[in-house]
Amino acid sequence: MTKPQQQSPPSTTATTTTSPPPPPPSTPPPASSSSSSLAKLPLRLHSLASSSRSLLSALRRSPVTTLVAAFFLLALFMYGEDVRTLAELSIDDYLYPDADFYNVSALPPLLLPPPTCDLSRGRWVFDNTSLPAYREKECTFLTKQVSCLANGRPDDLWQYWRWQPNNCSLPTFDARRFMEKMRGKRMMFVGDSLNRNQWESLVCLVQPILSKGRKKIVKRGSFNIFYAKEYRATLEFYWAPFLVESNSDNPNFHHIDQRIISPERIESHANNWKDVDYLIFNTYIWWMNNEDIKVRRPNSTSWSDHDEVPRIETYGRVFKTWSTWLEQNVDPARTSVFFMTISPLHNSPAQWGNPNGIKCVKETLPVLNYTKPLDLNHDMRMYDLVAKVAKNMKNVPVSLIDITRMSDYRKDAHTSLYSIRQGKLLTPEQKADPQKYADCIHWCLPGVPDVWNQILYTRILSKSSPPSPHPPLPPQ
C-alpha cells in the first residue's frame, strides 16, 4: 500500500463548529447463455487453446489447411456460445494458475473483538498514518459518482478518520486474508445505491492484491460483477432498491415520479440470490419520499392499479416476504446473511448545531463533541422492525451490521456538490443551488463505507476458522 501523505490534524477551532456531544462453485452469475453452455465453457476454451496451437503450425504448410483452419476456428468460437460470455472469459483465465494460497497460519493471530463488544458504539479518531486504506486515483474501478477528489472537492480530511469502538479494537482490513476466505465463493450486495457504494468500497479494498489483467467488472442487467479471477471469486452488486418487485427495478432508468411496489412478489429478484455464499442486504432510502407507499394490487395487470398503504405497514409486508424466502431457499450451512442498517442523510444542519448551514455543504469535519446520539429523524420503526425480523429467524440466521450511529456523525463525508447527476458532473449553475443539488446521501470513497466493510470483514472472520492450506479448487 502506498504510504499516505501526512496530513495535519484538524485544528481545535474547527471542531468547535460541531455540536456538543470464479464464478461460484456450482452456478455462475446469471448470463445470457444457458447454464449448461456455461458449464462447458472452460472445457471448450481449453480445447480452443490446444487446437489453436496445433493449427498455427499447420498454417505455414498448405493454403487448403489455412482455409480449413480458419473455418474450424470460426466454428469453435461460434458454436453454442454467447458472444458476450466469450468476451468476458478470456483464454488465459484457464491457461494460467490461480493465486498461490496465502499462508494465513504463518501470520500473527488475528485479534478479533469479543462477541460482547458493540462495534457500533465508539468515536472517530483522526489517523493520517494508516489511512486512507487506498487512494482514489489508484482504484480505477471507482465510478464518477463517488470520486470526490477527481470531481473537484478541495479538501481531503474526510479520508483520515478511523472508527474506534469503545471497548475493543477493530481489526485492520487484510485483503489477502479476506480473499483467501473468498476463494471459490460469491459475495453479493443486494439493495440500492448505498449498497452499491459499499460494494465499490470493497472492490477498491481488495483490488491492489490482484494481478493486472486478472480482475474486471462486468455489468449485466441488474448485476455489477467484480471478477477476482486468481481466486475464482466474485464480488457482486444486485440492484433491488425495495428488495421486492417494483416499477423502479431497471438499474439504469429508475428515476420515476411514482414509485410502486409489490410487497408479496420477490421471485424475479430472489432467483438470482441462490447459491451465493455471502448475502448482504439493505433497503431504506427509497422508502423515505412519502409516509404512504404505493402498493400494486394483487392480480393487477398494470402498475397504475395500486393503493396507498402506510410506510411501516408496507415495510413489514416486504420483510415478511423476504424472511420467508430466506427460510425456504437458503442453506445456512453454506450461506451467511447480513443486513446493513440505516445509512443517514445529512440534510438539516441545525441537527448538528449549524443552523446557518446548507445541508452537508462545506462540512469538513465529523461531529466530534457529542455526549449523546444525534437525532437525524431516521424512521427508527423501520430499524426496529428489521432487528425484530432478524431476531425471530428460525433456520437462517441474519446478522445485523449496525452502521447507523457511527455514520450519523459523518456529516463531512458525503459526495455533496462533487458528484454527478444523470451521468454528468454538476454544472456551475447547479453548484450554485446546493439546497437542490447537493448529494448528502452517498459517500465519497475512500471513506465511511470502508469502515462498514471493515466491520463486515470482522464479522465474517469471527464466524469461522482459517481455511485449510490446500482446499480443493471449485469446479471450472
Curated annotation (Swiss-Prot):
Its EC number is 2.3.1.-. It is a single-pass type II membrane protein. Residues 8-18 have a biased composition (Low complexity). A motif (DXXH motif) lies at residues 439-442. Keywords: Disulfide bond, Glycoprotein, Golgi apparatus, Membrane, Signal-anchor, Transferase, Transmembrane, Transmembrane helix. Residues 1-37 are annotated as: Disordered. Highly expressed in leaves. Expressed in roots, stems and inflorescences. GO terms for molecular function: O-acetyltransferase activity; xylan O-acetyltransferase activity. Residues 19-31 have a biased composition (Pro residues). It is an enzyme of class 2 (transferase). Pfam families: PC-Esterase, PMR5N. One of its GO terms (biological process) is xylan acetylation. PANTHER family: PROTEIN TRICHOME BIREFRINGENCE-LIKE 9-RELATED (PTHR32285), XYLAN O-ACETYLTRANSFERASE 3 (PTHR32285:SF285). This is Xylan O-acetyltransferase 4. It comes from Oryza sativa subsp. japonica (Rice).
